[in-house]
Structure formats: structure tokens, C-alpha cells
Amino acid sequence: MTPVLAADGLTFRYDPAAPLLEDWSVEVGAGEVVAVTGPSGRGKSTLLYLLGLMLAPRAGRVLLDGQDVTTLPDARRARLRAHRFGFVFQDAALDPTCTVLDNVLETALYRGDDRATATRRAAELMAEFGVALRAHARPGQVSGGQAQRIALARALLGEPDVVLADEPTGNLDPESATVVLDALHRQAGRGAAVLVVTHDPRVVARCDREVVL
């Protein structure tokens, strides 16, 4: 079966003399939750940016449903990100000028989703993740753990085919971390490919397999 997402021989470097990733490959199938681990500075976050079409590799390919999407025009890559991918960044990456609710809705509205329907779904996810009462607050008024759960709600709002999560439980207590991991597994159960960058062995234990950088 063709994997949902694959990297084929990815090479990337910020410093020409020091490759961060060198001829690196992975496949993630529908329904899989894969942990990406390794020492700090090995390029785990960069790998997610490459797989999420936010960076272009120096060499190699990113494949979505078996199709090479590495060299698509920027506008096409942006549409794929909005329609097929969900991202949870390590620092949550919330817009401080918008309310929490508008941050959750941002990608859905970019896709052209109906606002009322998206708002109802956002409210359900925010309640599930324990941040419903913060809907009209600004990101600067919520804790780091709450911001991470808000970012997860944004990532899952569109039922993405691929979820890329960078330390999604890093700021969370064990109970909240379980809620987040359960949500990622439910998305995988719907057929998504899920990659989770983590240093937490408890998170690795909940994943289907581990890939070490």
C-alpha cells in the first residue's frame, strides 16, 4: 500500500559545511503514529518543516500519496498544507493579535470552510482539550500548556490526512498529555499519518514505532 507521506533521500543544511539531514528517508502509512526522536540539534524540527512543505530540501523528495510534491509552486504547496496537513509547532505559533478562537479558525477560513460550521467544530475541540473558556482571550493571556492545546485544536480542525506535531506534550501535565495523545491516535484511526517529534519516552511508548535521527 502506498504510504500517505514519505521522505526519499532528503538532504538539508543551513551551513554548507555541516549537513543537518543527509540522504534521509521514511514512510508513514495511513493510521500510523510515528515518534521521531534523537539528540537536540539533529534536525527533528527541520524535518517536520521539510515534510510539511515549508522548507525545500537540497536533495531528495517529499511524496504525498506517492506523488512528488517537492518542487510544486509555492501557491500549490500552500493549498496542500491548508487542505491536507495539520501542524502543531513546538512554540504553538499563535498569532498574538487574534483571539484564541480566531487562531483555531485561521486555517479553516483560509481553506474557505463555512465559518459557522468551523466555529462549532472548534468549540467542540476546545472543550475536549480544556481551553473552551479561553476562546475570547488573547494568546498572551493563556499558559504555555493551554497554548499547545489550542494549537492542537487548530491542527485537527480540518481532519487532516497528515499531522506533524513538534513536542506536542512538552508543556503539559500528564493528564493533559494523555488527552493530546488520545486525540492524535483518534486522528490516525481516521486514516491520518501522524509524526510526533518528542524527547519523552512516555510519548514514544504510545506511538506505533520510533524513528531515530
Question: Model-found features: residue ranges?
Answer:
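Helix-to-loop junction immediately C-terminal to a conserved catalytic motif
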Residues: G52
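Conserved ABC transporter NBD signature motif
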Residues: G60-D68
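ABC ATPase NBD coupling module
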Residues: V69-F85, G189
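Conserved signature/switch motifs of ABC ATPase nucleotide-binding domains
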Residues: A82, A137, G158, A183, ...
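Short coil-to-helix segment of the ABC ATPase nucleotide-binding domain corresponding to the Q-loop/switch region
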Residues: T97-E106
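Conserved ABC ATPase signature
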Residues: R138-V142, Q146-Q148
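Catalytic Walker B motif of ABC-type/P-loop ATPase nucleotide-binding domains
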Residues: V163-D166
